[in-house]
């Protein structure tokens, strides 16, 4: 009988690319230190949202200003995690600007 392999998939999302890269590096280093294999970080496509607003509250319809928000995403797969890996990931402190979703498969 074949033993089923365990995998943890972590998706990170944030507006600041530097903060996101530091967080992924922390997660990868923690997982490798506890003996798990790591696939990634895989950069996913960046979502770009552009908002156009009027510069003036009353007239000058042609005068507009554009703002954009870029959402950067990363994907990390942790293969064959141990109990130490899961405990270390729970104790890891991530910055407030990074959204994390963890899925066990």
From Swiss-Prot:
Keyword terms, alphabetized: Ribonucleoprotein, Ribosomal protein
Entry's transmembrane regions: none
GO cellular component assignments: ribonucleoprotein complex; ribosome
SMART domains: Ribosomal_S10
Matching Pfam families: Ribosomal_S10
KW Nucleotide-binding (keyword) present: no
Function of the protein: Involved in the binding of tRNA to the ribosomes.
Annotated family: Belongs to the universal ribosomal protein uS10 family.
HAMAP family to which the protein is assigned, alphabetical: Ribosomal_uS10
Protein name in the entry: Small ribosomal subunit protein uS10
